[in-house]
Amino acid sequence: MSDQATRPARTPANRRKAAVDDSEALGIRERNLRLILKAASQEFAAKGFQAARTEDIAARVGLPKANVYYYFQNKRNLYARVLETLVEPLLQAAALLRAELPPEQALPAYIQARMRVAREHPHTYKAVLGEMLLGARQLPAPCGERLRQAAQDNLACLRSWMERGLIATADPQHLLLFLWSATQAHTHFGWQASLITGKTRPAEADYRAVAESVSRLVLGALAVDGARGRLRPFPL
């Protein structure tokens, strides 16, 4: 009897069952990847790359350590993936600083987007900040290049506004660094912030309040003569 004769017929019902099985397998894989990355971001944020252990990451998820290696091969690959997950949100925020937009619209939108990244990805954000303090040596090169180009685009936007008299003249590099530091302070300096706020973890309303305060301070400081009446408060 031929092999073809012994195989089950490829009926529509069989094909539907195979498609369901494939979909379920893909769903399990995506779920495991998401859970492992979340657990890894928590471990790396708390302990850094060197001290974080793969078995502790697996324990957070409730999976065998072998499963972590199955999906990511080694801890270094997993760390790189954690860092990569924050790149796209940061780039989306950076894209909001556009020279064709008025600064009173673009700057608050950029500040709010940066604060949203910190709020929605607190552990990953902290892990990335820790890596940057070490020189971003383990950040994948393509990610670093995209972030570098986005920063250059943001500087060009700030220069354009200054040259057209839309905002007061200042060193655009210093201004961009200030925007970065102001929007990541709650994540980077959590303990220091708690001394002022009395909260161990900021709530969503706290992030919104910080975004509004920073926006008003920045717009007020950058207002040029005759422009203060034109700059309107940013509604959050």
Predicted regions and their residues:
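Amphipathic alpha-helical linker/stalk segments
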Residues: 23, 82-109, 151-160
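Helix-turn-helix
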Residues: 35, 43-77, 81
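Hydrophobic alpha-helical connector segments
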Residues: 95-124, 172-179, 208-211, 227-228, ...
